[in-house]
From Swiss-Prot:
It comes from the Bacteria. Part of the 30S ribosomal subunit. Forms a tight heterodimer with protein bS6. One of its GO terms (molecular function) is structural constituent of ribosome. It comes from Mycolicibacterium paratuberculosis (strain ATCC BAA-968 / K-10) (Mycobacterium paratuberculosis). NCBIfam families: S18. Binds as a heterodimer with protein bS6 to the central domain of the 16S rRNA, where it helps stabilize the platform of the 30S subunit. SUPFAM superfamilies: Ribosomal protein S18. GO terms for cellular component: cytosolic small ribosomal subunit. This is Small ribosomal subunit protein bS18B. Keywords: Ribonucleoprotein, Ribosomal protein, RNA-binding, rRNA-binding. Belongs to the bacterial ribosomal protein bS18 family.
Amino acid sequence: MPKKPARTRRPAPLAGRARKKNLLDSLGLRTVDYKDTATLRVFISERGKIRSRQVTGLSVQQQRQVATAIKNAREMALLPYPGQGIKP
């Protein structure tokens, strides 16, 4: 019976890439406030969607904090919901 070819190991996730810069640390913030819409807009795309951790470079806890703040700001009508842009 022929042997199966040996599988090669996948490279480490950050082997050749530099780590993404943490946006909250670069802005000098420890906590996120839902009333600070200028800061929250950094974490929202042009379409109004929350940017992912891979894009923003946030930790898990920071991403949760930002997402909660954005959702609270949307409820208070400080930020738009996704899909409420200009329609053709």
